[in-house]
Regions:
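Alpha-helical scaffold domains
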Residues: 1-201
Length: 201
């Protein structure tokens, strides 16, 4: 596993974007950030999956184990690759919560929800659980996940009421605002409901 992780890091360094990396160091968002752009990371994730797991590997390393090992690294690119490579069907709820609770940056929260959480069979459950938490980053994950889900599936009447209640109490969170905007854009009736929430507040 260590050899594979080191090989991946070498490839990441070779694709380093110096300007983005320098900016990240100034903001101290990450312990290590090579500034590799997302399209290249997506291509690299495909290459890893094709080359490492397309045939019987020489080492007994599963995609899940590799994704977890990458997530454990204090490196922007490794964490994003971990989100891209984790098989959704193998991500149990307990591990999902552990990952979510360890997130420290909005970018990683965004990548986590986009590449992984929205694909999970319990994504809706997690979204509403996290929205109700006090921790800001978990709230972010909840609203980000719901943003993706609402574009694909209608909310039940009960879920709709809970969402409007939670989001209405979290208007200082820009992801709650984004979720309300997406919800309002889906129908005129939804837009009226969002307006009522805003007028009430």
């Amino acid at each position: 596993m260590n050899n594979l992780i080191n090989d991946i890091k070498k490839e990441l360094r070779a694709n380093m974007n110096g300007v983005a990396s320098a900016h990240a160091r100034q903001t101290e968002d990450y312990r290590v950030n090579w500034g590799v752009e997302l399209p290249r990371l997506a291509n690299l994730a495909d290459e890893i999956a094709e080359n490492r797991f397309s045939s019987t590997p020489s080492e007994d390393i599963s995609p899940r184990a590799l994704a977890q090992a990458l997530w454990n690294e204090s490196t922007r690119e490794c964490k994003i690759l971990g989100c891209m490579l984790m098989p959704a069907e193998e991500m149990d709820e307990e591990v999902c919560d552990i990952w979510a609770e360890s997130i420290r940056t909005e970018e990683i929260a965004t990548m986590f929800c986009f590449y992984l959480v929205q694909k999970l069979p319990y994504a809706s459950t997690k979204a509403f659980e996290w929205m109700a938490r006090e921790e800001k980053m978990l709230q972010n994950c909840g609203y980000l996940t719901l943003c993706h889900l609402m574009r694909k599936y209608p909310l039940s009447e009960e879920a709709e009421a809970e969402f409007l209640d939670q989001a209405g109490a979290s208007l200082d969170n820009r992801y709650a605002i984004k979720a309300l905007q997406i919800y309002a854009s889906l129908s005129e009736d939804n837009a009226r409901k969002v307006k009522k929430v805003a007028d009430y507040l």
